[in-house]
Regions:
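Hydrophobic alpha-helical connector segments
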Residues: 3, 7, 14-48, 98-101
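A short secondary-structure junction motif
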Residues: 11, 41-46, 83, 108-111
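Secondary-structure edge/capping motif, primarily at the C-terminal ends of alpha-helices
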Residues: 19, 23, 49-53, 112-116
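Short secondary-structure transition hinges
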Residues: 44-78, 85-89
Length: 158
């Protein structure tokens, strides 16, 4: 199972890096694409998440979350630094902010430690978007796309 999860994470990180390396995209577009892609439901990712967070797999789930945080934060840090040059972000701690935001997201929303229902989960996602704006010095509403799809479509955000 570890090898399957590692391959899945490798694929996700390669996709994120390809977006980050695109010189034609603004930091805003890169961040949007990576964060929206990571929030998309897909059968394989959902199955792996459920197996990794099953009872008895806590160690595997913790290693998976740590791997995602450690591998995705430098990619997002580069995008934050680009955004700082473009004037959309302003922070003294781009790497640390991304590590903390990713860790919170992974643990609170994907770790299986909490059984948030749709409305509760939506509130957590809204709070995370608000925190990201504050931590990265972005304008109010900058990260609303993290939850607008669920609000607009009335979708379940489980």
């Amino acid at each position: 199972m570890d090898a399957v999860i590692a391959r899945y994470i490798d694929t996700e990180m390669e996709a994120a890096q390809a977006i980050a390396d695109n010189p034609q995209m603004s930091a805003e577009e890169k961040m949007f694409r990576i964060l929206r892609a990571s929030g998309q439901d897909n059968a394989r990712g959902d199955r792996l998440e459920k197996e990794a967070s099953a009872v008895g797999n806590a160690d595997m789930q913790q290693r998976t979350m740590a791997s995602i945080v450690l591998r995705l934060s430098p990619i997002l840090e580069g995008i934050v630094r680009q955004g700082m040059r473009e004037g959309i972000f302003q922070t003294e701690y781009p790497r640390e902010c991304m590590e903390i935001l990713l860790a919170a997201s992974e643990f609170m929303l994907h770790g299986g430690a909490f059984a948030w229902e749709g409305a509760q989960r939506l509130q957590k996602i809204k709070a995370l978007a608000w925190m990201a704006e504050k931590a990265l010095g972005a304008k109010k509403g900058h990260f609303n796309y993290l939850y607008e799809k669920f609000e607009k479509d009335g979708e379940n955000c489980d």
